[in-house]
């Protein structure tokens, strides 16, 4: 397999360590997503990229982006993945700034299905946020970008690696005291907060300072005057400082907040509205492959502290 098997490459965003393109497989005519990584620019991160590829091979859930193949061309690693045609939840937030509780509940329901599967397999995501939750035009929601995901060993209940994105990190991850799958639950709660308010807690503060605040302060909470009791309780169940006190994905999937609204067609409706909005706004077309790859190393450097909804 080589890059010539793909045509019509259009830059659609930035992923872990590199650029992400929409492309068409010449043989199957299938539209795919290509993550292209400049190995010269990421020599110290190749091990993590290899981990991502091996991790994705084993996954089999409708709510997790599918992995197809990978190959090296020159100094670039190409990873072929499922293309999600609805955009990320971060993209969809551009339409209205926030999601209604009905939409949030449906997103959470589907992400929780992915987490029930992952955690049941002894695996975790470790970087859940709106930018890593992708959608399809039919309303399907999928977890993506497992660049920092890891597999929990059967006889080991914690991990000391410092991974994730600062604003969404659980206290125990920041403190590096060891963590397990409950770190995903914290990130899920922060993501629910992000979808409801348009940005994660501490968004106006420099990421390095946030790393000091997360373990020091009480868990974030939603304003009860603005949100339903059920939603506030759902988020509260996710954002317990002690991981042992946090709910499991299985428990949260049956929470009254989820049962109140789900299942529903709200995600499909938002995706359709977003597509119409993009068309009416005449947003710039995706950037062709040839005009972007020449400075891919610079592109990677420029997005080091780009955390999506965080405003500067």
Curated annotation (Swiss-Prot):
Active site, renumbered: 127 (proton acceptor)
Show the GO cellular component annotation of the record.
cell division site; cytoplasm; cytosol; division septum; nucleus
Give EC number(s), comma-separated.
2.7.11.1
Q: Where is the Protein kinase domain?
A: 6-258
Q: Which residues bind ATP?
A: 12-20, 35
Which keywords belong to this entry?
Answer: ATP-binding, Cytoplasm, Kinase, Nucleotide-binding, Nucleus, Serine/threonine-protein kinase, Transferase
Q: Which domain of life is it from?
A: Eukaryota
One of its Pfam families is Pkinase
| Catalytic activity of the protein | L-seryl-[protein] + ATP = O-phospho-L-seryl-[protein] + ADP + H(+); L-threonyl-[protein] + ATP = O-phospho-L-threonyl-[protein] + ADP + H(+)
What molecular function terms (GO) are annotated for this protein? ATP binding; protein serine kinase activity; protein serine/threonine kinase activity
Q: Which Gene3D superfamilies match?
A: Transferase(Phosphotransferase) domain 1
Residue intervals passing through the bilayer: none
EC class name: transferase
Protein family per UniProt: Belongs to the protein kinase superfamily. Ser/Thr protein kinase family.
This protein is called Serine/threonine-protein kinase ppk11
Q: What is the lineage of its organism?
A: Eukaryota, Fungi, Dikarya, Ascomycota, Taphrinomycotina
Quote the gene name from the UniProt entry. ppk11
């Amino acid at each position: 397999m080589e890059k010539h098997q793909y045509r019509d490459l259009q830059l659609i965003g930035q992923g872990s360590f590199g650029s992400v393109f929409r492309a068409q497989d010449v043989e199957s005519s299938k539209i795919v997503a290509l993550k292209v990584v400049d190995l010269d620019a990421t020599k110290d991160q190749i091990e993590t990229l290899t981990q991502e590829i091996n991790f994705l091979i084993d996954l089999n859930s409708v709510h997790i982006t599918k992995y197809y193949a990978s190959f090296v061309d020159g100094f670039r690693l190409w990873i072929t993945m499922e293309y999600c045609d609805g955009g990320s939840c971060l993209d969809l937030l551009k339409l209205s700034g926030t999601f209604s509780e009905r939409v949030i509940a449906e997103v959470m329901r589907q992400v929780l299905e992915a987490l029930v599967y992952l955690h049941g397999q002894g695996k975790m995501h470790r970087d859940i946020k709106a930018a890593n939750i992708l959608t399809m035009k039919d309303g399907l929601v999928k977890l993506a970008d497992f660049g920092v995901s890891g597999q929990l060993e059967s006889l080991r209940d914690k991990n000391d690696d410092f991974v994730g994105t600062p604003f969404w990190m659980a206290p125990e991850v920041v403190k590096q005291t060891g963590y397990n799958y409950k770190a995903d639950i914290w990130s899920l709660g922060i993501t629910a907060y992000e979808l409801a308010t348009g940005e994660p807690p501490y968004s106006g503060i420099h990421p390095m300072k946030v790393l000091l605040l997360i373990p020091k302060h009480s868990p974030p909470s939603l304003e009860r005057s603005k949100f339903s009791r059920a939603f506030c309780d759902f988020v509260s169940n996710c954002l317990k400082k002690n991981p042992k006190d946090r709910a499991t994905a299985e428990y949260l999937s049956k929470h009254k907040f989820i049962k109140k609204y789900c299942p529903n067609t709200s995600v499909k409706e938002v995706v359709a509205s977003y597509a119409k909005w993009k068309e009416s706004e005449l947003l710039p077309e995706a950037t062709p492959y040839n005009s972007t790859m020449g400075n891919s190393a610079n592109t990677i450097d420029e997005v080091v502290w780009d955390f999506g909804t965080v405003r500067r």
